[in-house]
A protein has these predicted regions:
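Class I S-adenosyl-L-methionine-dependent methyltransferase catalytic core
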Residues: 1-174
Length: 174
């Protein structure tokens, strides 16, 4: 679904700047082209640290053991880039430290996640990654804004429910 969404965004009239208010894993954002500037925001500090780290050449591991997973989960601030990678890429269902990802076929989730992330990041080398609340993001005039918020009545990164009503009020003010 990321490619069709990116096509719609690229057909949007006007704007030199593309702004994503909730970039997440950048599945859509990595496919958007034709803008001189990309501002990609998310409020998850470890996710943004990971994206910035990979953008700057951080060498992600290809293997993470369950013991390493637990250690990184308990010591996130020792290496925020690695914590972001392991917390999402090596976790069950990609949920932030939602349990060590494993299956019966022995899939190497670290290797799979690294490969996928590096592929997407190849198109985001010039992107500006921002960690913040979407309501406080400085959006340049005439930007094309993409907002794919958390689903209504779901638990967000911090355990708080996303306020969909407040989101729509903020969107109407843009």
């Amino acid at each position: 679904i990321a490619k069709p969404i990116a096509q719609i965004i690229m057909q949007a009239a006007g704007g030199d700047c593309f702004v994503s208010l909730f970039c997440g894993s950048c599945a859509v954002e990595s496919k958007v082209q034709g803008f001189s500037r990309k501002i990609l925001n998310d409020r998850h500090e470890y996710l943004i640290a990971m994206l910035q780290g990979v953008q700057q050449g951080y060498n992600l591991p290809e293997h993470i053991t369950p013991e390493q997973y637990r250690y990184i989960r308990e010591n996130k601030d020792a290496d925020p880039v690695l914590a972001g990678f392991v917390g999402f890429g090596c976790s069950f269902g990609g949920k932030w430290f939602g349990g060590y990802a494993r299956n019966k076929t022995g899939t190497n989730y670290a290797e799979q996640s690294k490969r996928s992330l590096l592929k997407d990041m190849a198109t985001l080398q010039d992107a500006q990654f921002v960690c913040g609340d979407y309501r406080r993001l400085c959006i340049p005039p005439n930007s094309v804004i993409y907002a794919d918020p958390p689903y209504n009545n779901t638990t967000g990164y911090t355990g708080d429910k996303f306020d969909t009503t407040e989101f729509w009020i903020a969107m109407r003010l843009l």
